[in-house]
Amino acid sequence: MHSRCLFLAALICSLSLRAEIKAPQPEFKEYLVAPVRVHLLVTKGELNLTTTLEEKDITRIFEKVNRIWGHAGIHLPVEQLIKEPAENPNAYRQNYQSRNLRWLLALRPKTSRADSWFHVYYLKRFGVNGVYIGRNGMFVKDTARLRGVKDGMDEPIPRVTAHELGHAFTLKHRQSVTNLMASGTSGWTLNEAEIKQARTAAGKIKWISPAGEILKEADALHKQGKKKEAAALYRRIAGIPLHCPETARAKKRADR
């Protein structure tokens, strides 16, 4: 009986550390849209360089990422999902114990690199949960583990992904345990100063556009009968976590 009570107490405590991310408040017109190219590294004979994440996992992960970043009025649609082998597996074998993680850049396949978009690479294992090396080099391991905090996220990978994207928006670590930029916790919140800083940084990146501009361009293409081109733009904004006429129209036309 005593052990059962302890188990139930531990379970209740565990559940109390997890909470659904609150719904974002910004209106549609406030959103800035920053496309992401996701790379799933799957390398034959290299278990550490082979993620077991699938497309359905990425969909779930980025739904949570966007619920976090929605509080800053920033949306991060997965523009492209690529499954590919690491470019240089030897870089892992030679450097996996190194504290300098820039060697991870050597894993990026040359054919899928691009200056536009954010690039997030998923693999199985390396020394930390995730690392931001540049807009075109963010790395997250699918075995990430975090320290639970009150009202924190229920899953590590979306939180680690959102954290590294925070660095892409120039945010630094802030060791308030419930904060997104704290190290190693399940916290996901942003304060007003961080939101302002992230939006200012996003506004300076030429390939990040306001949602309203994307919708206007998509509507124009749709009116011209260019349904395929319009659908690509509608998909970019359809996942914004709002129930409004703009997202409803985008969702309806995104599959055409």
Name every feature range the model reports, one short phrase each.
Residues 10-18:
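Hydrophobic h-region of N-terminal signal peptides that target proteins for export
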Residues 20-114, 124-126, 234, 241:
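Propeptide-to-catalytic entry region of secreted or membrane-anchored zinc metalloproteases
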Residues 48-57, 132-137, 190-201:
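Short, polar loop/linker segments at the starts of domains and inter-domain junctions
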Residues 1-6:
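Bacterial N-terminal signal peptides that target proteins for export
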Residues 28, 106-174:
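Active-site-proximal segment of zinc-dependent metalloprotease catalytic domains
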Residues 24, 148-213:
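The catalytic-center signature of Zn2+-dependent metalloproteases
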Residues 38, 78, 119-122, 139-140, ...:
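Structural recognition of the beta-strand scaffold that forms the well-ordered cores
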